[in-house]
UniProtKB/Swiss-Prot annotation:
This protein's UniProt keywords: Cell inner membrane, Cell membrane, Membrane, Protein transport, Translocation, Transmembrane, Transmembrane helix, Transport
Compositional bias segments (type: Low complexity): 141-154
Role noted for this protein: Part of the twin-arginine translocation (Tat) system that transports large folded proteins containing a characteristic twin-arginine motif in their signal peptide across membranes. Together with TatC, TatB is part of a receptor directly interacting with Tat signal peptides. TatB may form an oligomeric binding site that transiently accommodates folded Tat precursor proteins before their translocation.
Main location: membrane
Organism of origin: Phenylobacterium zucineum (strain HLK1)
Subcellular location: Cell inner membrane
Xref: NCBIfam families: tatB (TIGR01410)
Family the UniProt entry places it in: Belongs to the TatB family.
UniProt keyword annotation of Membrane present: yes
Keyword Cell membrane: yes
Region (Disordered): 104-178
Name of the protein: Sec-independent protein translocase protein TatB
Membrane topology listed for this record: Single-pass membrane protein
Length: 178
């Protein structure tokens, strides 16, 4: 609200309004004051928005002028630089023409010199032969597996267990009871 009006001042204003207007018309008066304040605030915000738009527009105009000035300055600098480049190229050509050297443009350059033949690479004196790659175990033939088995003799052959039969167990238990 207003920074100059405190709580005490608001109470005094409310008491005077109650006495002057009366309790019957006070709610209607408060509603009209609220509507008036809303209109004032909306008008102030519209004014502020239009003022901000004008400020932005003037800033944009200034920026546009600066950009145009920079563009003109750059193109002017480019034409000056282009003139200086052509002048320098002309000076170089004149000085080389006095010596008897001809300049060729890079696009018209042809290589007339043949490159020297490549020198043969020296071979190393002794290079170990590379080991052959191992084959996977699944890919080995079965014939190769037999000599390995013969090369490694088994220490002792275990006897095969006898097959168990149900009748045999019953006989042993019956025989031990006798």
């Amino acid at each position: 609200m207003l920074p100059e009006i405190g709580a005490a001042e608001l109470l005094i204003i409310a008491a005077v309004a109650l006495i002057v207007v009366g309790p019957k018309d006070l709610p209607l008066l408060m509603r009209r004051i609220g509507q008036f304040m809303a209109k004032v605030r909306s008008m102030a915000s519209e004014f502020r928005a239009s003022f901000d738009d004008m400020a932005r527009q003037s800033e944009l105009d200034d920026l546009r002028k600066e950009v145009e000035a920079m563009r003109r300055g750059q193109f002017a600098d480019m034409s000056i630089a282009d003139g200086a480049m052509t002048e320098a190229a002309g000076d170089i050509e004149k000085s080389l023409a006095g010596v008897g050297v001809q300049l060729h443009s890079p696009t018209g350059y042809e290589n007339t010199v043949e490159p020297p033949p490549p020198e043969p690479e020296p071979q190393p004196a002794a290079e170990p032969a590379p080991k052959p790659a191992r084959k996977p175990r699944a890919a080995k033939p079965k014939a190769a597996a037999a000599p390995k088995a013969a090369a490694k003799p088994k220490a002792a052959a275990k006897p095969k267990p006898k097959p168990k039969t149900p009748g045999l167990k019953a006989r042993k238990t019956a025989g031990s009871a006798e």
